[in-house]
Amino acid sequence: MSNGNIWVTDSLRMRSWTSWNPEIIVEAENSMYHASYSRVAGDPERVYVTPGTQNPEIAGRVSNNAYLEVQPVSMSANPGIVFYLPNVRSTTYSVYIVMVPATIVSTSYKAKPNCMSFTMGMANEKGKNVEVSKEWTVENNFTNDTTKVDTLYLGDVTFPMAYAGTGDYYPYLRVTSYVTSRMRDFQDRVMRIDCIILRPKELDDFLKEHPDYKYDDGTYN
């Protein structure tokens, strides 16, 4: 080179999540990433929450001061929504979803937990579209804590192909209410979703070992 030197190294003096493999945060209220709905009353609604309007008895904060409310088309219906997942790299992610309780701005509601199932859709090593659910989730169904803005760990998933820079071709996450008729008096079919987090597993492991580490370089969508 005419203007510098080149060295060969087997180690990069940086953490991958601060450069080529960032955390991805998909704000659920961003309609750009709504692929489809099922058994939903109208379009899901963006609901705003600020620190001033939030119920002080609910722990945690709603990211971006807004969440998505998904209403069932009837009292007996379990609604579902599919989210596109942008900028996914070929790596292993720890997947989280952040849920908001009904009492986030009011104490007049009786907060009931959601029960949900999740399915991830992606392309495999041969480029064929596949769906995975039980293979990558910790449990088949998940419930949230109604005393806080609750972050649920769904499990780890490995993407064999990268999608960043490929235009409108995305993997997706299907979120479906899973409340049986027997449980409808105790569980809520209305889903209030704050965001979806795809955290590189390397970062997830690091945060568990270093809980005071501050990381603010996630990619927000």
Mark where each language-model region is.
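Extracytoplasmic
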Residues: D10-N221
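Extended non-catalytic domains of envelope/secretory-pathway proteins
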Residues: M1, W7-V8
